[in-house]
Amino acid sequence: MKLHYSPSPAETKRLEPEQLRSAFLISDLFQPGQLITHYTDLDRMIAGGVTPTSAPLPLPNSKQATGTDFFLERREIGIINIGAPGAVRVGGKSYPLGSLDCLYVGKGERDVVFEAGSAGQAQYFFISTPAHMTYPTAHAARAQGTQPIGDPAKCNRRRINRYIHANGIKSCQLVMGFTEFEPGSVWNTMPPHTHSRRTEIYLYFDLGTDMVVHLMGEPQATRHLIVRDREAILSPAWSIHAGVGTGAYRFIWAMGGDNQTFEDMDQVAIADLK
């Protein structure tokens, strides 16, 4: 498990491009036959990528990072399958996950195992946050008929699919879902916002050979990162998080912090960006 210690806003302004990437970009999450995890001191979130092949991959214990006897002893986890159909076993029960399905597993589950499907490559992205009480394991299929938001004239027409949230799958603090775009739209979260009470992690995927220019940093001192397919971004509470793609893409978003109110954000006017 790789550990990430987040720079302050003042330090972030002075970082060279490679230092910025090292601090806020995760680029190695998906490797065949491996389960890869990254731990950030931002709200103590863990991001993981799982690519099972012939052998199932169990959720590992990392006592150095969590200080517990097993991974979910004091944590919860949200999982989204971004590949072909597969399954996740929780305590011996199998949960089939189709493409873009979500599974939530609550605090206290000792055995979580990721499995490949019979056709194609299943790939799982997960986020884990600390938890103080137990909520039941819950599965959600990919949402159908989600109403789009945004304006085609501003290239930001998109559908927000919410899975783990106050009015959906219940959790202690984790909020999770994914966003996809209408044809011709490529801007996400513009005008941007911050939310000083929560950390957010993005995973950009289904880019193909295209890229996303991800904007981050304080609103009056913005920076950018070039992001490729299946790369993740760590977004501190003080940072904006927005982006524009050179083609179609999707992104998973996950948050942890003081509340689960989706609308709790501090809007930033485009005119105020620098």
From Swiss-Prot:
Pathway: Glycan metabolism; pectin degradation; 2-dehydro-3-deoxy-D-gluconate from pectin: step 4/5
GO biological process: D-galacturonate catabolic process; D-glucuronate catabolic process; pectin catabolic process
GO molecular function, one term: zinc ion binding
Enzyme Commission designation: 5.3.1.17
InterPro entries in UniProt: KduI, KduI/IolB_isomerase, KduI_N, RmlC-like_jellyroll, RmlC_Cupin_sf
Positions with a binding annotation for Zn(2+): H193, H195, E200, H241
Domain of life the protein comes from: Bacteria
Catalyzed reactions: 5-dehydro-4-deoxy-D-glucuronate = 3-deoxy-D-glycero-2,5-hexodiulosonate
This protein's record includes keyword Isomerase: yes
UniProt cofactor note: Binds 1 zinc ion per subunit.
Pfam families: KduI
UniProt KW keywords: Isomerase, Metal-binding, Zinc
Task performed by this protein: Catalyzes the isomerization of 5-dehydro-4-deoxy-D-glucuronate to 3-deoxy-D-glycero-2,5-hexodiulosonate.
UniProt family annotation: Belongs to the KduI family.
Record-given protein name: 4-deoxy-L-threo-5-hexosulose-uronate ketol-isomerase
Protein species of origin: Opitutus terrae (strain DSM 11246 / JCM 15787 / PB90-1)
